[in-house]
């Protein structure tokens, strides 16, 4: 009985996908981005709101890119905050530094 329910939902999903694909192709051919009367056909279907959400996400991405362009100072500050909050990471970094120093000392002793 569950097989029938799954098959029905798969068929419905397939039909929805084919219909959506057809709409996308038609919109691409008709130039959806250029509404002639000022009201996009999608606005009636509620899809216009989705377009606005994408625009907002793009604006946020642009702001992030601007931060990256300004410099890496922000990234260094973020790392310091993380290390200071946990305390463990800073201790681990100190241990790694000690290992590096010891390795260097051993190399110099062997060279002499």
Swiss-Prot record:
Residues 1-112 are annotated as: Disordered. Residues 9-35, 102-112 have a biased composition (Basic and acidic residues). This is Prothymosin alpha-B. Keywords: Nucleus. Residues 41-83, 92-101 have a biased composition (Acidic residues). Belongs to the pro/parathymosin family. One of its GO terms (molecular function) is histone binding. GO terms for cellular component: nucleus. GO terms for biological process: negative regulation of apoptotic process; positive regulation of transcription by RNA polymerase II. It is found in: Nucleus. Pfam families: Prothymosin (PF03247). PANTHER family: PROTHYMOSIN ALPHA (PTHR22745:SF0). Transmembrane segments: none annotated. Its main location: nucleus. InterPro entries: Pro/parathymosin.
């Amino acid at each position: 009985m569950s097989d029938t329910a799954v098959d029905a939902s798969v068929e419905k999903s397939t039909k929805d996908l084919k219909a959506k694909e057809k709409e996308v192709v038609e919109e691409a051919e008709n130039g959806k981005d250029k509404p002639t009367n000022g009201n996009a056909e999608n606005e009636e279907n509620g899809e216009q709101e989705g377009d606005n959400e994408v625009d907002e996400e793009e604006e946020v991405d642009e702001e992030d890119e601007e931060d990256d362009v300004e410099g890496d100072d922000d990234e260094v500050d973020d790392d310091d905050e993380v290390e200071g909050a946990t305390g463990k990471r800073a201790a681990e970094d100190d241990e790694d530094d000690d290992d590096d120093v010891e390795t260097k000392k051993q190399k110099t002793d062997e060279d002499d």
